[in-house]
């Protein structure tokens, strides 16, 4: 177990900003092929193991990419009781724990058939995330009994995840010279009441499987101009705007589908403007009913929380695989300058995973 910090430092030393995961993928492929493991590659994502011997399958899941480094974390290092480096908490620490568990002969011979899933593209655009293509290319993964996504959770067990939707809500008016506004209809000011309602709309707590998820609507952008989406035709300063668009971001609980989320936005707008849903990511169910989710909760002896954000747990939920978030990383350190993870968190996470994977 003392080798875990060294493994993390080795992972941190590899350049793997989103889009540059080729070297770490090659390193993982060589590492495990050299040990005689079954290795499958999809683009820059690596899947290792899978005996298909009838034991319940547990996926140990982590992404290999990181956001661009800062001067404070460019050079990985051990600093007293912490490991510093870009991606230390998000999520090379989780990947290191997953790898060490996968490489433990006793755990490999235990009650579960372990599969390591190290995928690329999580930190970039949604359509560049390679986990979806991996699950499509390797359909056997979609029959797994549990996926442990080792994103940073501060050593808590986080179940499910919020869904996310972006909708462009466009108010229409009629253009006119700003010196004679009565000859037109101002689309911008027509949106005033809606924006005020949005500003004062309280978060809604929704209980799913005994966990409380907080739904929120947030205006995250706005532009006036012609009919081209995104304000590509900007509105001149001396023209009454004929169109005004607000980007509404809706974070919704796991009890709703994408269609239900879109219907909720339509209910909020109430016919006052047109709506174009431009992006939607489904929520992930908590799946407390799943046998191995219950077993993990019991053996982890950790705080159980809802995931108040979107994670790749949702992708597993879409294909019917029970999944949970658990990892040694500090959520408050993700993407921070000088990113670090406490060494003790590594050891504690390894202990929890080892206890669970060893079985009752």
Enumerate the predicted regions with their spans.
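Acidic/His- and Gly-rich active-site-bordering loop/insert found
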Residues: 1-88, 106-111, 330
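Conserved strand-to-helix beginnings and helix N-cap segments that scaffold or border functional pockets
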Residues: 22, 95, 127-132, 181, ...
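Fold-independent oxyanion-binding glycine-rich loops
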Residues: 42-44, 62-64, 119-121, 150-153, ...
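Short glycine-aspartate micro-motif
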Residues: 57-59, 83, 143-149, 166-168, ...
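Alpha-helical metal-binding/catalytic segments enriched in His/Glu/Asp
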Residues: 60, 80-127, 168-171, 181-202, ...
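Acidic-glycine-rich active-site phosphate/pyrophosphate-binding loop
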Residues: 65-79, 159-171, 324
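Acidic/histidine-rich catalytic neighborhood of metal-dependent amide-processing enzymes
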Residues: 96-166, 228-229, 233
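Metal-dependent amide/peptide-bond hydrolase catalytic core
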Residues: 159, 166-360
């Amino acid at each position: 177990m003392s080798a875990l910090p060294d493994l993390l430092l080795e992972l941190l030393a590899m350049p793997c900003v989103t889009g540059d995961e080729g070297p770490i993928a090659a390193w993982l492929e060589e590492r495990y092929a050299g040990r005689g493991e079954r290795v499958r590659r999809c683009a820059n994502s690596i899947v290792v193991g899978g005996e298909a011997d009838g034991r319940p399958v547990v996926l140990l899941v982590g992404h290999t990419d990181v956001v661009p480094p800062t001067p404070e974390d460019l050079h990985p290092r051990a600093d007293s009781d912490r490991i510093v480096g870009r991606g230390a908490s998000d999520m090379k620490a989780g990947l290191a724990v997953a790898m060490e568990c996968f490489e433990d002969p006793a755990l490999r011979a235990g009650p579960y058939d372990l599969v390591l899933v190290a995928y690329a593209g999580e930190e970039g655009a949604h359509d560049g995330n390679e986990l979806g293509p991996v699950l499509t290319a390797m359909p056997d993964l979609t029959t797994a009994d549990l996926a442990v996504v080792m994103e940073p959770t501060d050593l808590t067990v986080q179940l499910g995840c919020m869904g996310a939707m972006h909708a462009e809500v466009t108010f229409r008016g009629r253009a006119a010279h700003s010196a004679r506004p009565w000859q037109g209809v101002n689309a911008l000011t027509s949106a005033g009441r809606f924006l005020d309602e949005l500003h004062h709309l309280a978060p809604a707590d929704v209980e799913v499987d005994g966990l409380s998820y907080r739904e929120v609507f947030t205006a995250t952008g706005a532009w006036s101009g012609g009919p081209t989406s995104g304000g590509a035709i900007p509105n001149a300063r001396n023209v009454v705007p004929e169109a005004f668009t607000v980007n509404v971001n809706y974070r919704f609980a796991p009890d709703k589908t994408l269609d239900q989320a879109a219907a909720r936005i339509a209910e909020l707008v109430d016919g006052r403007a047109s709506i174009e849903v431009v992006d939607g990511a489904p929520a992930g169910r908590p799946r407390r009913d799943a046998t191995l989710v219950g077993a993990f909760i019991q053996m982890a002896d950790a705080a159980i929380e809802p995931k108040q954000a979107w994670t790749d747990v949702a992708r597993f939920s879409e294909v019917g695989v029970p999944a949970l978030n658990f990892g040694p990383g500090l959520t408050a350190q993700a993407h921070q300058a000088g990113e670090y993870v406490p060494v003790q968190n590594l050891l504690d996470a390894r202990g929890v995973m080892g206890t669970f994977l060893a079985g009752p």
